[in-house]
Amino acid sequence: GYNYINNNGYGIDDDTAYNGIFDGKGHSISGLFIETKKYNKQGDNHYETYCQGLFGIIGKEGTVRNVTVNGQINAQAEGNEYINAAKYIGGIAGINAGLIINCTNNADITGLAYVGGITGQLGAQFKGSNRVSGNLINVTNNGTVTATSKSFAEAGGIVGQLAYGDITYATNHGNVSAPFKDDDMYSYLRGVAVGGIVGKDISVSECGKIDRAYNDGQIGTEDGNYFGGIIGCNYACDITNVYNTGQGIGYNYSGGLVGYKLGGTIENAYNSGEVNTHTEYQLIGSMRNTTVNNLYNIGDSTKLVALENGGDISTVYAVDTVLASDLSDAFTDSYNLPVIDWSNAPTGEDETFDIESINIENGK
């Protein structure tokens, strides 16, 4: 489905969003097929294609739970930010300012700008109101995710663009890419961002968090500026209890956990995926004025974090292996490496579910 966005004025019209409760009762929706015309003319406005997914926009009172989506979403557009079409694309929702819980996407997804396996953008600004946070809890993506813009693509296995909101218990198995290559290097200069969980967060405050998440999909952007196994570009959101085992390729700011880190925290995390980048940093491609805690890279490399303009990397380690006890109570030991303990993940069965009840910090 899609929602029309009236672009006259700042923010989204609340009456265009879904504000009900959709409970899939554990069923799958098969054969979902969404395809738009291919737009590539600069200055054209096709706002009816802006938000694509099972739901176009989930509003602040909306809940979608207990459903699996199978199919394909191909929101076609090519060019840069002046192509007003196919921008917010996700398997469950184009934009989510409500709650998505216990949902899985198996659909392959293509869009121009902000593209995620679950939602293109998390959080929103509605007209006449403050910023509204969205929440994702116990979500999984298995489909491929592709963003095609040459200047501002943000692709994530779970979320393309994190504006305001929390992600708790999230898994990405799908390949994520922003494959655009261009001779004039728009993608390098403007910051194409790709991540296993989130492409990029945009808020310098009140952004939210990523907690209990992992990626094992392949992540790549050959000419893009930011690649991270968890998040490509991290300005503000806090990250705890995460790991990456997927391989990745990036051009400039690239790392197995975070490509570019300007704010927020990251702690209790490890990477065992191979990072292919000319900078060769395995955990964080660039970090400025932030502190990290208890990070591990499994492998031979000793180039772990590119530290710029301050920060503390005293608890960053290159190791042969890691145990759950080295990380936090959020992990449990498995056959090879620690995995996140999913035994307490909310299931979405309780209609009176309280989001505040899962505000878990530091694995406690």
Give the ranges of each region predicted by the language model.
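Surface-exposed repetitive/solenoidal architectures
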Residues: G1-K364
